Amino acid sequence: MKLTHKILLIIGLTSIMSSCRQDIVPNELLPKFDRILQDPTALTQYDFSESTPFHHIALPFDFGSNQFHDSLIIDKLENTHIKYITYIYSDYKKVDEFKQEELNRERLYGLYQYMPNLFDDDEVEWSTIVQTGGQTEKQATNLFHGFVVHYRPSPTMESMKAEIDYLKSMIDTALTFVAPTTEGTSLIITLGTDIAISDSAGFYYERELDFSTVTAHTSALGTYDFGNYFNDTSVSAVRNRNKHWERMLIHCDLTGSMSPYSAQLFVWHRLNIDKNKVQHFVFFNDGDMTTDDQKKAGKTGGIYYSKADNFDDLQKIAYKCMSNGSGGDAPENDIEAMLEGFKKCKDCKDIILIADNWANLRDYEFINKIDRPVRIILCGTQFGINKQYLDLARATKGSIHTIEEDIENLMDLKEGQEITINGHAFVIENGRFTEVKKI
């Protein structure tokens, strides 16, 4: 009888121990977490060196643990715009009975307890990577396990001043090394290295962009090439491929972190100003210093206009736009800026929007007011394409342009049809683009 009780006790304890992991995560959160975890990308080993030069912070776990290695790191993400989060784990099991999916959920729940809003934010994009390179416990322990969070700091007056100083330095250096009248000359610029902080295991905690210019020189390649430091040289790449654009009206987002792209635009324009390719510029910063709760879609403000024929005046207006624009959240007033631009140039031929792929359209609801084709140069597309800009291009019979390709046929897509852009598949559902998850 006593033996029977012992057996029952052992069975009971085993049952409790096997179920305690899943009890950590509330049932109502399981659908959110499972959507993030579905269809992971398999890699032998996650390599931080392949990350982009955007700000990012790593939040590591020890192998097999659901406790953050150092939860204080999460404080660095306060007052930031988080756009992309990657969860990384390995598939090695010390015992066959181990349930990896439960540990994955627990780790997500650990992040949820600190930042629950991330899991309900439609602007945050998630991905999951499973590492297959750990064939032993020692090998698996040496792999990174945790989250990599890509973010941008919220703009401040100080950060915008730093971006203006960088932009001035970039333009001045470029124009010193490349004569405006030189035909078939390219500008190659190497920028300062990034800042990395690592823990004792060698994992990056943080990586930031340094705006200083290190070297600049010319070559005879016939294009404007901004070097290999930036993974995204969208503006120069698109302009080099589309030399037929003319009588342009260019709308350029000058909110925080857009200076690497606006630098390419300004240098290109200065080197081509005598060709009269561009007639007008419109810069926008999403409402100047207006606080987020006071911004109204369609009437946000922070829009600045300049003719294209005087480069000095153009720079002054651009810097004024940047100086006045440090009070914002992520969405931008692209539609409002374009409607203002149309008033200035009714006979412009090619309408260009240089847009921040990280930011949604604050005034998306007014897309139907744009009655001219818009050529959208998307900046920051390393992690995917913002669907709202696809909708804008299709609705206006315009086009999307990334560092890799030009997509001109969006207006021809019918309901239910699919298209692949930069390796991401999209389908038209209810008149809008929806990303297709590949299984």
Give residue spans per PLM region.
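Bacterial Sec-dependent N-terminal signal peptides
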Residues: M1-N27
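Extracytoplasmic/secreted cell-surface and envelope-processing proteins
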Residues: D23-E28, K94-E101, M258-A263, M289-Q294, ...
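Von Willebrand factor
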Residues: E50-D70, I85-Q100, D122-T136, H244-K349, A359-L361, ...
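VWA/integrin I-like adhesion module and closely mimicked acidic/polar interface patches used
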Residues: N66, K99-S127, N357-T396, H401-E404, ...
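Acidic, polar low-complexity linker/tail segments
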Residues: K76-E78, I189-L249, S259-A263, L271-V278
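DG-centered beta-turn motif at the end of beta-strands
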Residues: Y89-S90, D253-T255, M338, K346-L361, ...
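C-terminal "exit" segments of structured domains
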Residues: I400-I439
